[in-house]
Amino acid sequence: METEKIVEAYLQHVPQAVFEKAKGIKVLITDVDGVLTDGGILYDNQGMEFKKYNVKDGLIVQHLKKAGFLVGAITGRASQVVENRCEELRFDFHYHGVKDKFKKLSELLETMELTLDEVAYLGDDLIDLPVLTKVGLSIAPADAVPYVCAAVDYVSPLSGGKGVFREAADLLLHAKGQLVPLIESLAKKEA
């Protein structure tokens, strides 16, 4: 009972309509730069690229997959650092250097025999709009560009790279009644 109260307090700001849309979701897809990261790119003197990721975002991926969700990324930039992170998280799929994300998503859904209504997508910028306006549940981080925030179903209070992916995952699990049992089962294992 205590866990339920904690989860309810944690997600109390999420509108009920968002939870209703989340009930039909089977796939969580994210952009990377500006969602899994804060959008910054660091380079060293040799041109090596560095990005900072939030470990809380990564931790939930395997639990989503165990709960039956597919998890993936479609990103506009091609970057070995991003590919490495997607592999490390064991995403079911990840596409890099994609300029037409809606076309790529449509091709992907056709092979998976899924519909747009079964997709939750996290994006933060202009390149994400064609997807965000057509999927079953669209989510943006707090620091997404204003016209993206205006177009999505839910704007998280969290910024890119600060746990927005984790919140979206928790939201999906909670909408399907799986977050509280997950927390309680893990708490019992550690007791």
Model-predicted segments: where are they?
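Non-catalytic pre-domain segments flanking phosphatase-related domains
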Residues: M1-T30, Q178-A191
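Tandem CBS (Cystathionine beta-synthase) repeat/Bateman regulatory domains
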Residues: A17-V18, K23, V35, G39-G40, ...
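Asp-based phosphoryl-transfer active-site loop
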Residues: K23-I41, L132, F165
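Short coil/turn segments at beta-strand junctions that form active-site/ligand-binding loops
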Residues: G24-K26, F69, D117-E118
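Short secondary-structure boundary segments
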Residues: V32, G76, V98, A142-V145
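Short, acidic loop-to-helix structural element flanking the phosphoryl-transfer center
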Residues: F50-A67, F102-S106
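Mg2+-dependent phosphoryl-transfer enzymes with acidic/Ser/Thr/Gly-rich catalytic loops
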Residues: F50-K51, E87-L89, F93-Y95, F102-A191
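Substrate-recognition element of Asp-dependent hydrolases with the DxDx(T/V) motif
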Residues: V61-R85, Y95, L132
